[in-house]
């Protein structure tokens, strides 16, 4: 099918998101199978899933990178991004949600809402992504569809509305009643569930289905209060409402984020996947429904609103970089306005660099098809971009527009790394550079005192997998040290400094004079460096050098050498020498000045605090809470259901190394826990002194 056959209203850009192990990749595999993209179904537990194309993913049975693929269904073109459910890969979820128009949240019918489902749901709220839900694994022991719906309401605050009523559950799960069409769908075992037949609603479910349908209609009546005809029918003659009318109101409610319809099925047993595909097309938004996208015009500094039109100016967002052994560097983009053609010259407005597109590729996991152009609403990949990284805006050379960036959280864990042989030193540097371009939460730095290379990331699994990739993709063998906490430094009061850098040693001297004011920035806002220089006391051409020096100075703090965060620096005054001043002199002076100001601004050390959720049998609850308290944890809350208790707490990461092992021994292996970065907080004075001594 060529793209020309698809209007914008027939495109769906969707993500599939869930907690690890809810069956998300299996659901995507079935979608690919039924939509005719794969001729053989990939099974995750056999290591053959199409979307999990990296070797590490196939070995570990988890999804690490968001694979993008395109399928066709009911006359629509669906671009699907499969996202990882493990907390160490939150940036993958964050960046895919940023470019999606809608999402399918997959839940496990036994567990309902799990901790990672809450994280992903919060991220989707942040970007206002409309969602429908699929309660998967209805064939499992203990499956409870209505329990899962209830947990969505309680834990996520979702307006979850069942649109199915399951027929049987666990091994007796044979199908579902569609509350909209009022038909019972029975999946035929001889076709492995690929086909089904419609029958009458079984007698023992008729009353329950009538109640559920009425609740569904009443909820829909509140979605669009201007639609009086629909409200009237709901109140006076609900049986006269057509399926078409229900779908219209349902679509409006989903797109406006007022409702989250919930379907059920078992992807593994092929039940309910085609029904899910139908409603992806019927209810989730097209790029047109998501409306205009906001950006900033760089020439005027004003906010602009871009219509989703293929004739408009080009505006695209790079949301992922991949290094491919055959093609080289691939940049994934989403086009919000205009058309991008193969061979065209464009501007990376974030970096003010010109780029040229050498190839355009439509991706299916790791297979690819060449394309001549991508237009508004498309998600695709480009080859040939040299400077663009995640979050950069690509636009026409004469239309300087910047779109909202993708925020990357600060890494929380550090490891020292060195090549096993001296000959690998350069290869290691190349590998680290390529990997940090792909993943904004992976940072590479050098410890100034020891000269060691330090890699930082979101957790041990994150760094483990990157190390695996170095060995496999870049053929680099490296030794890594023990994981360490990634501490940060910040300041707690306002201060200033006046610094002169003067050198006279025969020949041309060096001269720079810089005055700074520094103040604490809002937590989580990062560092800001601004110039308030007026009247040319420092010439305009030297200001970027001062800023660069200040930024480099902030890379290592004054207490223990950890990077400074949340500091606002203003360059307020200075002077220069006609002959002796240079960019280098001002850069060195900027770095010295910011260090001097920080020493006077009561610096403190910050540590990453993790949100920890533990699910434990109730008889071990006391031990688990006692253990978290000993680790300087702050208990946020606990709840119980079916002899299991869930405890949530905030605990410093430094106290959590080896936690899984001790939790297993505390609870005889019956408890599970998840941990995700929450925020950075000041360390207690006694611990700060110990860190500084080290």
UniProtKB/Swiss-Prot annotation:
Subcellular localization: Cytoplasm
Molecular functions per Gene Ontology: GTP binding; GTPase activity; translation elongation factor activity
Any one GO BP annotation for this protein: ribosome disassembly
Positions bound to GTP: 18-25, 82-86, 136-139
PROSITE patterns in UniProt: G_TR_1, G_TR_2
Cellular-component GO terms for this entry: cytoplasm
Stored SMART domains: EFG_C (SM00838), EFG_IV (SM00889)
Gene3D superfamilies: 3.30.230.10, 3.30.70.240, Elongation Factor G (Translational Gtpase), domain 3, P-loop containing nucleotide triphosphate hydrolases, Translation factors
Keywords associated with the record: Cytoplasm, Elongation factor, GTP-binding, Nucleotide-binding, Protein biosynthesis
Span of domain tr-type G: 9-288
Protein task: Catalyzes the GTP-dependent ribosomal translocation step during translation elongation. During this step, the ribosome changes from the pre-translocational (PRE) to the post-translocational (POST) state as the newly formed A-site-bound peptidyl-tRNA and P-site-bound deacylated tRNA move to the P and E sites, respectively. Catalyzes the coordinated movement of the two tRNA molecules, the mRNA and conformational changes in the ribosome.
Family membership: Belongs to the TRAFAC class translation factor GTPase superfamily. Classic translation factor GTPase family. EF-G/EF-2 subfamily.
Designated name of the protein: Elongation factor G
Native species: Chlamydia trachomatis serovar L2 (strain ATCC VR-902B / DSM 19102 / 434/Bu)
């Amino acid at each position: 099918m060529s793209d020309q056959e698809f209007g914008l209203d027939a495109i769906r850009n969707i993500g599939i998101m869930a907690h690890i192990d809810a069956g998300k990749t299996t659901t995507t595999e079935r979608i690919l199978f039924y939509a005719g993209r794969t001729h053989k179904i990939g099974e995750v537990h056999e290591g053959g899933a199409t979307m999990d194309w990296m070797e590490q993913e196939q070995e570990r049975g988890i999804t690490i990178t968001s694979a993008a693929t395109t399928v066709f269904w009911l006359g629509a073109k669906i671009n699907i991004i499969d996202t990882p459910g493990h907390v160490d890969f939150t940036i993958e979820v964050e960046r895919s949600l940023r470019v999606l128009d809608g999402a399918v949240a997959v839940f496990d019918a036994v567990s309902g809402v799990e901790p990672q489902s809450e994280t992903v749901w919060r991220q989707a709220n942040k970007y206002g992504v409309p969602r429908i839900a699929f309660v998967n694994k209805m064939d499992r022991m203990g499956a409870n569809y209505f329990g899962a719906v209830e947990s969505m309401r309680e834990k996520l605050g979702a307006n979850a509305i069942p649109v199915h009523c399951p027929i049987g559950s666990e091994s007796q799960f044979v199908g579902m009643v569609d509350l909209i069409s009022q038909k019972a769908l029975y999946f035929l075992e001889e076709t492995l569930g690929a086909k089904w037949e419609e029958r009458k609603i079984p007698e023992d479910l008729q009353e329950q289905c009538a109640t559920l349908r009425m609740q569904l209609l009443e909820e829909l009546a509140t979605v669009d209060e201007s639609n009086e005809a629909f409200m009237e029918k709901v109140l006076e003659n609900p049986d006269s409402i057509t399926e078409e009318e229900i779908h219209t109101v349902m679509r409006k409610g989903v797109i406006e984020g007022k409702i989250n319809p919930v379907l059920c099925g078992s992807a593994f047993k092929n039940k309910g996947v085609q029904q899910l595909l139908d409603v992806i097309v019927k209810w989730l938004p097209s790029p047109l429904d998501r409306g205009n996208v906001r950006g900033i015009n760089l020439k005027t500094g004003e906010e602009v609103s871009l219509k989703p039109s293929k004739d408009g100016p080009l505006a695209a967002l790079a949301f992922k970089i991949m290094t491919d052994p055959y093609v080289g560097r691939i940049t994934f983009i989403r086009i919000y306005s205009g058309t991008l053609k193969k061979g065209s010259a464009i501007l990376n407005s974030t970096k003010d660099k010109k780029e040229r597109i050498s190839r355009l590729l439509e991706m299916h996991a790791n297979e690819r098809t060449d394309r001549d152009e991508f237009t508004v609403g498309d998600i695709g990949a480009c080859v040939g971009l040299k400077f663009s990284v995640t979050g950069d805006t690509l636009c026409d050379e004469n239309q300087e527009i910047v779109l909202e960036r993708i925020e990357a959280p600060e890494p929380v864990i550090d490891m020292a790394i060195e090549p096993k042989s001296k000959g690998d030193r350069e290869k290691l540097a190349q590998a680290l550079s390529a990997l940090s371009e792909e993943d904004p939460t992976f940072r590479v730095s050098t410890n100034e005192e020891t000269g060691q290379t330090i890699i930082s990331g979101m957790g041990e699994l994150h760094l483990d997998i990157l190390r695996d990739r170095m060995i496999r993709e870049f053929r680099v063998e490296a030794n890594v040290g023990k994981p360490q906490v990634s501490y940060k430094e910040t300041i707690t009061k306002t201060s200033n400094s006046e610094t002169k850098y003067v050198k006279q040693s025969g020949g041309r001297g060096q001269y720079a004079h810089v005055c700074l004011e520094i103040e604490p920035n809002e937590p989580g806002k990062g560092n800001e460096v601004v110039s308030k220089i007026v009247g040319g006391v420092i010439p305009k051409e030297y200001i970027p050098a001062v800023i660069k020096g200040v930024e480099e100075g902030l890379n290592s703090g004054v207490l223990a050498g950890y990077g400074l965060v949340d500091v606002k620096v203003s360059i307020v005054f200075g002077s220069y020498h006609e002959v002796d001043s240079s960019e280098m002199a001002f850069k060195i002076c900027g770095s010295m000045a910011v260090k001097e100001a920080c020493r006077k601004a009561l610096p403190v050390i910050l540590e990453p605090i993790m949100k920890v959720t533990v699910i434990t049998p109730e008889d071990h609850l006391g031990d688990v809470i006692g253990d978290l308290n000993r680790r300087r944890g702050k208990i946020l809350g606990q709840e119980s259901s079916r002899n299991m208790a869930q405890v949530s707490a905030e605990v410093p990461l430094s106290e959590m190394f080896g936690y899984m092992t001790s939790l297993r021994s505390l609870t005889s292996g019956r408890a599970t826990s998840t941990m995700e970065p929450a925020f950075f907080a000041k360390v207690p004075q006694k611990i700060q002194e110990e860190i500084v001594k080290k």
